[in-house]
Structure formats: C-alpha cells, structure tokens
Amino acid sequence: MEWDFIPRNRQKNIHIKERFTIMANKVLVETSARHIHLTEDAVKALYGEGAELIVKKMLSQPGQFATANDKITLVGPKGTLAVSVLGPTRKANQVELSYTDARVLGLKNVPVRESGDVENTPGLKMVGPVGEIEIDAGAIIAKRHIHMTPADAEAFGIEDKQIVKVKIESERTTIFDDVVCRVHPNFALAMHIDTDECNAAGAFGEVYGEIIL
C-alpha cells in the first residue's frame, strides 16, 4: 500500500496558547511516503526542456507541494520503484526512502539523515518520461523529526535541534526516541515519520503523538 503526506486538518486561526491548552504536549503525526526532490536541471532532464513542477496539492509545510507531474522511476542494483516528486525545486537532488524501499532497490548503507544532508550518500538512476539521469549522491532515510515555529518551540520549552521522544498510542503503542526538533518561522507544527515507522506504530489516519522531554 502506498502512502502519501497527510495534509494538515486543523484550524490555523486558533491562538497558539489556546491550541496548546487543548492539545497539551501533542503534535500531529504525518506519514511521509518515499519521494524525491529535484533540482531545476534534473526537472529539465527528466521531463524535457521547459518543463516545470505542477502543483497538485499543498502539503502541511508552507510552500511545499505534491506535484501532478508523472512519477519518476528509481533504478537500483536489484529493483525499481516509482516515486512522486515534491516541489518546489531544490539546490540538490534528494531521494527519501524507508529501509524497506532501500532493500527493494538493493541500495546498501543508506544513512539516516536530516533533510538536506546528502553528502556521502548513495546515488542511483532516475528515469523520467523524457530522459534519465544518474546521481552520485542523494539517497537518505529521513531522520524522524518535528517541524515547529519559534512560538511553538517556546510553548513546548524546546530549542532548535533538540532531541525528544514522542509517544504514539495505538493498538501498537510506540515511543519513538531520537526525534529531532527543527525550528523555523516558515514551518508548521507536525511530526514526520516514514512508512516503516508508521506501520510499526500502527499510526494510521489522523494521529497525534505526545512529546516527552
């Protein structure tokens, strides 16, 4: 079963203090399926000269969107996978996988990294509707993390890059350790986990986790 980003389903005009009174120490947990971020040059190579990323739907993080462009095929030593492209374009190509995805592709030693940290990571082939490219690096397992604004961080008593635990209650209640908090004015409060983590915790549908400091 393929998962997608779960869009935010909350009222954004609720005052932050009221929101934390209602949802004390709670954070929305969103599951992020495998996907790629592309540079402008990669978009042209895969989709053709003059091609652009087309907005299909906006995601929970401001300015980020799922695209309506055809999926790209990732080609690894042992297998292939179709992946969605997220926008906007970036300065470096990035392939975000789960451990299961990496095994299907036959990629070894894919590191757990924060988004944007792609130095010394495996590369692979990408095949689009028009062309294909081979990237030297870019494949990562995304480190589980929480996006939050400075106001959110202040309310929680959390600093940028702080590591916390998050408890998700379900039929398979799980406490995730080593969750990095990423603080920026342009973020919206949400925790992101991958599909392996989602399945392990039974975190299906609209799910909230409890932040443990």
Short names for language-model regions:
Residues 24-26:
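Extreme N-terminal starter segment of soluble prokaryotic enzymes
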